């Protein structure tokens, strides 16, 4: 088996694990276990928090002491067992405690799998995209498998429900632990990566345009969790009516669109419109999606609007990493990438998870959740971000100042 094939399988399993539970866990927490919106948000906030902490844990182990494939195997095996145990947790305290430990184990593998792939590819700049896309395919496959599992199990209630998404993720994690021993040997580096390296890039914030860009990115990232946490419960509500068995498969529409936009849309848009206009399309797509959710009708339009995730995520967040790589001075480029990852994928999503959960509580009564009220909040905030971006952000000036 070629190294590329083994790396592709690694990425497939890495994101199949995440894709098995992340899109639908909130439905289980809110509807089956009776957690509040804030409690569900707090559980989703654990992975972004672990992402911030992971450079101090798994990254240091792999960089200094052990080969990366062995660290991945240990983390995934232990994490898989924890997920299976977590599937039987019913109290908030037990669920939160188990999930926090699990997230501390899983978060380092996100960076480690990228590192293993890049180190073992002959031309990582050209070949990494073709390997990474298997991660998104794995996410989609997990959703389809969970839907199939639920359909075979009767669709609701029954043997296959409960914490089934955590069982599936746990099983995939154990399989990945075994597959890790087939990965190319990746020994530890002589010098570890500094976990505080992102601080070196803070001087870039002196540039007005870059500071505006980071501020807008942070606010938009907080609103991402309204999609990840609340879309599942919203689609399964009476107003939309997606069944529990079909929900995981329906949610994969977003990732299918992400693959399409990544493969065909992003490079075309960057060449035709440039960085600023591409980012603008991405940030404007956010309030469009949330206003469709807020109206909540017709149901087919709400479901179809999941495809906007391709533009929301790829044209803004993926393009944002490309922009930072473009404007950062060469000597702090890696630090700048670490900074935007912490701002957008760490702190932003951590606070956004808590915020989304709290907003869901505010608009929930004994009669149910007012989804119009819920989604008007991220609609208003992302609209403000879009207006601020169009009025104040200028790519050319930002690039010059940051450099």
Predicted regions: what is each one?
Residues 1, 183-216, 237:
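Juxtamembrane intracellular "pre-TM" segments in multi-pass secondary transporters
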Residues 1-48, 209-250, 317, 353:
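Helix-loop boundary and gating motifs at the non-cytosolic
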Residues 12, 82-86, 92-112, 116, ...:
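Hydrophobic core of transmembrane alpha-helices in multi-pass small-molecule transporters
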Residues 53-67, 150-154, 261-275, 360-361:
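Helix-to-loop junctions at the C-terminal end of transmembrane segments
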Residues 53-90:
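Conserved MFS/SLC helix-loop-helix module at the cytosolic interface between two early adjacent transmembrane helices
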Residues 70-84, 277-292:
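Structural signature of the two symmetry-related core transmembrane helices
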Residues 86-87, 173-184, 376-403:
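Multi-pass alpha-helical transporter architecture, strongest
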Residues 148-172, 358-382:
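A membrane-interface helix-boundary motif in multi-pass transporters
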């Amino acid at each position: 088996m070629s190294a590329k094939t083994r790396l592709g399988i690694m990425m497939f399993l890495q994101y199949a694990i995440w894709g098995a539970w992340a899109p639908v866990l909130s439905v289980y927490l809110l509807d089956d276990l009776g957690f509040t919106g804030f409690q569900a948000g707090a559980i989703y906030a654990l992975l972004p928090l672990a992402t911030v902490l992971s450079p101090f844990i798994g990254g240091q182990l792999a960089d200094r002491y052990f080969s990366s494939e062995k660290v991945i195997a240990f983390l995934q095996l232990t994490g898989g067992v924890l997920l299976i145990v977590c599937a039987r947790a019913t109290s908030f305290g037990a669920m939160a405690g188990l999930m926090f430990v699990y997230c501390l184990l899983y978060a380092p593998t996100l960076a480690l799998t990228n590192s293993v792939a890049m180190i073992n590819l002959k031309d990582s700049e050209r070949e990494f995209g073709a390997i990474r896309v298997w991660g998104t395919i794995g996410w989609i496959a997990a959703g389809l498998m969970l839907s199939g599992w639920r359909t075979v199990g009767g669709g609701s209630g029954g043997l296959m429900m409960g914490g089934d998404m955590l069982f599936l993720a746990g099983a995939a994690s154990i399989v990945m632990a075994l597959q890790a021993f087939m990965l190319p040997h990746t020994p530890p580096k002589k010098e570890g990566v500094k976990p505080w390296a992102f601080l070196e890039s803070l001087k870039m914030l002196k540039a007005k345009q870059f500071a505006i860009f980071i501020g807008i990115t942070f606010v938009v990232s907080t609103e991402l969790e309204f999609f990840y946490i609340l879309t599942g419960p919203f689609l399964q509500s009476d107003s939309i009516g997606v069944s529990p068995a079909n929900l995981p498969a329906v949610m994969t529409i977003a990732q299918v669109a992400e693959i399409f936009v990544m493969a065909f849309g992003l490079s075309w848009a960057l060449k035709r419109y440039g960085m600023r206009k591409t980012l603008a399309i991405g940030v404007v797509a956010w309030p469009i999606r949330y206003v469709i959710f807020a109206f909540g009708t017709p149901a087919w339009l709400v479901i179809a609007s999941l495809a906007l995730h391709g533009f929301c995520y790829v044209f803004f967040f993926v393009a944002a990493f490309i922009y930072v790589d473009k404007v950062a001075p060469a000597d702090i480029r890696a630090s700048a990438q670490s900074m935007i990852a912490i701002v957008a994928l760490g702190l932003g999503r951590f606070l956004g998870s808590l915020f989304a959960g709290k907003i869901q509580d505010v608009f929930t009564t004994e009669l149910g959740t007012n989804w119009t009220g819920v989604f008007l909040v991220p609609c208003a905030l992302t609209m403000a971000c879009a207006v601020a971006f169009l009025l104040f952000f200028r790519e050319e000036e930002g690039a010059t100042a940051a450099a």
